[in-house]
Amino acid sequence: MKVVAFERSVQGTGASRRLRNSGKTPGIIYGGAAEPKMIELDHNALWHALKKEAFHSSILELEVAGKSEQALLRAFQMHPFKPLVLHVDFQRVSANDKIHVKVPLHFMNQETAPGVKLGHGIVNHILNDLEVSCLPADLPEFIEVDLAAVELNQTVHLSDIKLPKGVTVITHGDDNPAVASISQPAGAVSEAAEGGEAAGETPAA
């Protein structure tokens, strides 16, 4: 995905406010061997790009003053109540250095999973993304979680997921976290419990 930016020479609160008033968003690109560079981007283009999942989890081609660099979106700041992007940070990436990125999970075959179709359960997304380590060339836009064989009251763990080649997951303590499950709706559980209590009641003498 290509992102066009321009060099920014003036910085400070006042300069940033004037920049935003002109339809631009201030930003910075840092990392690698080069010095950090102050940049500005078209606000509307950035606003629409931020709505795309791939913009947050893929290697971007960031063009500044006609020269392209590979970069990752690292952070962005939104206005508390206006639809306004206040600032954006990009990090340069090197083809030979591993990166740590949060990659979204895509849950496949949710409606046809046995636990949903036959067991009338609901799918619970315990995790919505995974932090991974890989080379830039191996970074996936998303990771699939296949629920095709998941029964009612079963849980899918990290070990059940087939990871793309060259990708490892950073788990922060739990080596095999739960990712998703299929369970009975809360109402169905309550009704079943009430039915059991009613069946066990003994008529008064």
UniProtKB/Swiss-Prot annotation:
Leader sequence residues: none
Gene Ontology MF: a single term: structural constituent of ribosome
Keywords (A to Z) from UniProt: Ribonucleoprotein, Ribosomal protein, RNA-binding, rRNA-binding
KW Ribosomal protein (keyword) present: yes
Region (Disordered) location: 184-205
Pfam families listed in its UniProt record: Ribosomal_L25p (PF01386), Ribosomal_TL5_C (PF14693)
A GO-annotated cellular component: cytosolic large ribosomal subunit
Cited SUPFAM superfamilies: Ribosomal protein L25-like (SSF50715)
Gene Ontology annotations of biological process type: translation
InterPro entries: Rbsml_bL25/Gln-tRNA_synth_N, Ribosomal_bL25/Gln-tRNA_synth, Ribosomal_bL25_b-dom, Ribosomal_bL25_C, Ribosomal_bL25_long, Ribosomal_bL25_short, Ribosomal_L25_dom, Ribosomal_uL5_bac-type
Listed CDD domains: Ribosomal_L25_TL5_CTC
Bias type Low complexity, positions: 186-205
Record-annotated disulphide pairs: none
Ribosomal protein among keywords: yes
Quaternary structure note: Part of the 50S ribosomal subunit; part of the 5S rRNA/L5/L18/L25 subcomplex. Contacts the 5S rRNA. Binds to the 5S rRNA independently of L5 and L18.
Known function: This is one of the proteins that binds to the 5S RNA in the ribosome where it forms part of the central protuberance.
PANTHER family documented for this protein: RIBOSOMAL PROTEIN L25/GLN-TRNA SYNTHETASE, ANTI-CODON-BINDING DOMAIN-CONTAINING PROTEIN, RIBOSOMAL PROTEIN L25_GLN-TRNA SYNTHETASE, ANTI-CODON-BINDING DOMAIN-CONTAINING PROTEIN
Family indicated by similarity: Belongs to the bacterial ribosomal protein bL25 family. CTC subfamily.
UniProt name for this protein: Large ribosomal subunit protein bL25
Organism: Cupriavidus necator (strain ATCC 17699 / DSM 428 / KCTC 22496 / NCIMB 10442 / H16 / Stanier 337) (Ralstonia eutropha)
